[in-house]
């Protein structure tokens, strides 16, 4: 089965072709980071317009890279939610228009299920079951994954997502957009232990997260720097140490909760997915914990940590292989800007 995947939930337009026999044939991605940088964040209307401009050229690129023909495509998978309503509507409309023109079925995919399954695209994919740590700009969750469509929420953030905390911390420190990579880069130049920030809910006894207090602690430190009238090199060093303190605190919590989830489920495999899953400090800490405690940790390729069409094509192929009745052949569709991943559980 050859499936075309279309991702448009936020500020990346991604298309890909995935074959159930041959794997990922090709994928192409356009990021809108440069367009949104002057605004300090994603502007939904601009994002939607750009998806319209980019989708069809990316489709031609993917078809050319793969060597496949349009008539070879068996189905079209698209991100149905969660995400920005307008952006989702663009991707869904394009998917269903192509499907109608080509006489192909469609299937709507949960964006987070795509991330959840993205590590299956590597050369040696992890077998089921496993614990998944989903960490992105909008979501932070721990899930028990027994099979495709068999998900149990073990814990989730009670306020800010980890990626959101990274972005807000970057803004507080005065870094550019996108904030997550910038604060991580600055943290690598900071002195470990120079600034120690709280580890929210580290000892809460459950698997939930909270990052709003950590963000507030960063704001408090910045006010202290201002009161001390730091400037020049002294302020630059203080900001680097603060960034290091923030990243260390966030990573400590993510690692500790992941270890607790493995202990609770008695599983020996951890999958990490989502944009924050590309963070080098997080990967290093989890890999060190895995070596020490004897469990396996799996990540998607760095290029597939961000939103992408490959994960949507994969999820669509896996769903249609298991549940052919999910194929939509009447081309009526809805999008779901808010959509609980646990609601997919079968």
Curated annotation (Swiss-Prot):
It is found in: Cytoplasm. It catalyses: L-threonylcarbamoyladenylate + adenosine(37) in tRNA = N(6)-L-threonylcarbamoyladenosine(37) in tRNA + AMP + H(+). InterPro entries: ATPase_NBD, Gcp-like_dom, KAE1/TsaD, TsaD. It comes from the Bacteria. One of its GO terms (molecular function) is iron ion binding. Binds 1 Fe(2+) ion per subunit. Pfam families: TsaD. Its cofactor is Fe(2+). Keywords: Acyltransferase, Cytoplasm, Iron, Metal-binding, Transferase, tRNA processing. Fe cation binds at residues 111, 115, 307. Its main location: cytoplasm. It is an enzyme of class 2 (transferase). One of its GO terms (biological process) is tRNA threonylcarbamoyladenosine modification. Substrate binds at residues 134-138, 167, 180, 279. GO terms for cellular component: cytoplasm. Belongs to the KAE1 / TsaD family. Required for the formation of a threonylcarbamoyl group on adenosine at position 37 (t(6)A37) in tRNAs that read codons beginning with adenine. Is involved in the transfer of the threonylcarbamoyl moiety of threonylcarbamoyl-AMP (TC-AMP) to the N6 group of A37, together with TsaE and TsaB. TsaD likely plays a direct catalytic role in this reaction. This is tRNA N6-adenosine threonylcarbamoyltransferase.
């Amino acid at each position: 089965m050859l499936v075309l995947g279309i991702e448009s939930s936020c500020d990346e337009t991604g298309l890909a072709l995935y074959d159930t026999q041959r794997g990922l044939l090709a994928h192409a991605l356009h990021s809108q980071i440069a367009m949104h940088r002057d605004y300090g964040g994603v502007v939904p209307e601009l994002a939607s317009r750009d998806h319209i401009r980019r989708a069809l050229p990316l489709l031609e690129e993917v078809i050319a890279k793969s060597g496949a023909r349009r008539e070879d495509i068996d189905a079209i998978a698209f991100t149905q939610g969660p995400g920005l309503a307008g952006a989702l509507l663009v991707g869904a409309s394009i998917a269903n228009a192509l499907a109608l023109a080509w006489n192909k079925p469609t299937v709507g995919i949960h964006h987070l299920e795509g991330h959840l399954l993205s590590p299956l695209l590597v050369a040696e994919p992890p077998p089921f079951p496993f614990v998944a740590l989903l960490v992105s700009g909008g979501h932070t969750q721990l899930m028990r994954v027994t099979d495709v469509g068999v998900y149990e929420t073990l814990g989730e953030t009670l306020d800010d997502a980890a990626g959101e905390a990274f972005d807000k911390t970057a803004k507080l420190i005065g870094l550019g957009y996108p904030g997550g990579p910038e604060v991580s880069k600055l943290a690598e130049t900071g002195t470990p232990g120079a600034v120690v920030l709280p580890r929210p809910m580290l000892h809460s006894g459950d698997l939930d997260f909270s990052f709003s207090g950590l963000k507030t602690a960063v704001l408090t430190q910045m006010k202290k720097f201002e009161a001390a009238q730091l400037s020049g090199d002294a302020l630059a060093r203080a900001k680097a140490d603060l960034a290091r303190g923030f990243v260390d605190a966030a990573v400590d919590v993510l690692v500790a909760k992941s270890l607790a989830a493995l202990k609770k489920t008695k599983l020996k495999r951890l999958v990490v997915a989502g944009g924050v899953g590309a963070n080098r400090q997080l990967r290093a800490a989890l890999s060190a914990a895995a070596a020490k405690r004897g469990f396996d940790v799996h990540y998607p390729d760095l290029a597939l940590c961000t939103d992408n069409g490959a994960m949507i094509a994969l999820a669509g192929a896996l769903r249609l292989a298991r549940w052919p009745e999910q194929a939509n052949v009447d081309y009526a569709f809805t999008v779901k800007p808010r959509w609980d991943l646990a609601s997919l559980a079968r």
